[in-house]
Design a protein with these regions (language model features):
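A C-terminal junction/extension of Radical SAM enzymes
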Residues: 94-167
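Radical SAM/AdoMet-radical enzyme domain recognition
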Residues: 1-92
Length: 167
């Protein structure tokens, strides 16, 4: 969708007029090497979003030894475009299928790993302590129990499955 917005601004306007006010945009790095799929198109896509009043969430897939050294740069790029980029949703890569341990360890990165790298790459401007876990499924089941007066199952996820902060 970002490449389409970059190449065809009219399509971006049509999407906005159809009611879409936010675009989740793949953005894996600040260099052509780490973000080959849409590095050159990103500025044009942001310009289209700026003109149409569409906000953007960058969604980088983070892969250890590939782009984990650019997390601070991604945040800085988002800050430079704060008028249109309202969030960055870092997604550690999901490795599935048959893969040897050494290869898995080469690329695997966790949310806590990302948070640590962000602190290092922002020179402590965004610290590990600035983050909080975002799992919010359990309160929903508690509300359902309160309204139904019947015990329900609890939906929960591991605390390290997500983290958020505001900067």
């Amino acid at each position: 969708n970002g490449i389409r917005h970059a190449m065809d601004p009219e399509a971006g306007r049509e999407v906005r007029m159809a009611g879409c006010n936010n675009l989740y945009l793949s953005f894996d790095g600040v260099t052509a090497r780490t973000n080959p799929k849409n590095h050159w198109e990103i500025p044009h896509a942001l310009d289209t979003c700026r003109k149409t009043g569409t906000t953007v969430v960058f969604v980088p897939t983070v892969i250890k030894s590939i782009n984990d050294h650019e997390l601070g740069g991604i945040i800085r790029y988002a800050q430079k475009n704060l008028d249109v980029v309202h969030a960055v949703n870092f997604q550690p890569v999901s490795l599935t299928g048959r893969m040897g341990k050494s290869e898995r360890e080469k690329y695997r990165i966790t949310v806590p790993d990302c948070v640590q790298r962000i602190e290092e790459q922002t020179d402590g401007q965004v610290t590990v302590d600035d983050w909080f876990p975002v799992p919010s499924c359990m309160p929903l089941t508690n509300v359902i129990e309160a309204f139904s007066s019947k015990p329900k199952y609890e939906l929960s996820i591991h605390f390290a499955c997500g983290a958020g902060t505001y900067i």
